[in-house]
Amino acid sequence: MKSLKELSLRIKNIRSVQKTTKIMQMVSAAKLLQSQKKLSNSKLYISKLHDIISSIMSSADQELLAKIFTTGDNDSYLVFIIASDRGLCGSFNSSIAKSSQEYVNKLIASSKKVDIVFLGKKAFDIGKNRFDSKSILKIENSKGITLKRVEALVDSMDLSKYDRIKVFYNKFYNTFTQKPMLETIKPWSKSSSLIDDYLTNSTIDYNYKYEPQNTEFILRSLIQNYVVTALYSALLESAASENSARMAAMESANRNTKEMLNKLALLYNCSRQAAITTDLIEVIGGAESL
């Protein structure tokens, strides 16, 4: 049985860890609320943008649509992999690592040309050993990425040379559920994992007037805007999922520390009682020998 001093020191250390995990849980909960607010606003915007593109496409010339949306032979892919900047968030990063690795390996096995952009320090750590030869850009601080920075990132890249653009991210469903998701942002699609169905109004026939009256120019501009917004929305989804996963992980850690403290307190009391009993026996034995 461990000494009382050892048990006391261990209890002290676990209480210190418990304070840290409790603070991290509270901070993650506060950050989650902020992330959810940003995500809600982003979903509303991208849904309306999606509706506008759908409406313009419904009245556009088919030859023009073929010209804008027809891609090459689907041989070249750009894949964004979004993960967190820090750990202690359960399986948040490992699930993205597993999903993205399986997908990219399939593309490579099919002789596809694949370029990868890592967003987040953990994404960089994931790709360092797996896909380093395929990496064209690594951004370690994904939390610092704003809409303007995403726009600058997209503008700095020649996306026209890619037939397909994909984004791996953790989709936020609720506080307890986040799942790895693969979203296609090029070519544009009528369905998107970034858009909630209840926000879309695709059945409504909007009567838009354009200036200038150049459908091709407007569609290309909107599609470019959609790529930026979709990537930014995926980052917000990932941020909300990360904060939720970390909050859940810290809550679980708090429960575990409470259980450990209860067990150690019981063990400490038993050891203390045994020590007192031993001392009493020695005192009584000494008195009887006199």
From Swiss-Prot:
It is found in: Cell membrane. GO terms for molecular function: ATP binding; proton-transporting ATP synthase activity, rotational mechanism. GO terms for biological process: proton motive force-driven plasma membrane ATP synthesis. Keywords: ATP synthesis, Cell membrane, CF(1), Hydrogen ion transport, Ion transport, Membrane, Transport. GO terms for cellular component: plasma membrane; proton-transporting ATP synthase complex. The keyword Membrane applies. It comes from the Bacteria. It is a peripheral membrane protein. Pfam families: ATP-synt. F-type ATPases have 2 components, CF(1) - the catalytic core - and CF(0) - the membrane proton channel. CF(1) has five subunits: alpha(3), beta(3), gamma(1), delta(1), epsilon(1). CF(0) has three main subunits: a, b and c. Produces ATP from ADP in the presence of a proton gradient across the membrane. The gamma chain is believed to be important in regulating ATPase activity and the flow of protons through the CF(0) complex. NCBIfam families: ATPsyn_F1gamma (TIGR01146). HAMAP family: ATP_synth_gamma_bact. Belongs to the ATPase gamma chain family. This is ATP synthase gamma chain. It comes from Wolbachia sp. subsp. Brugia malayi (strain TRS). The gene is atpG.
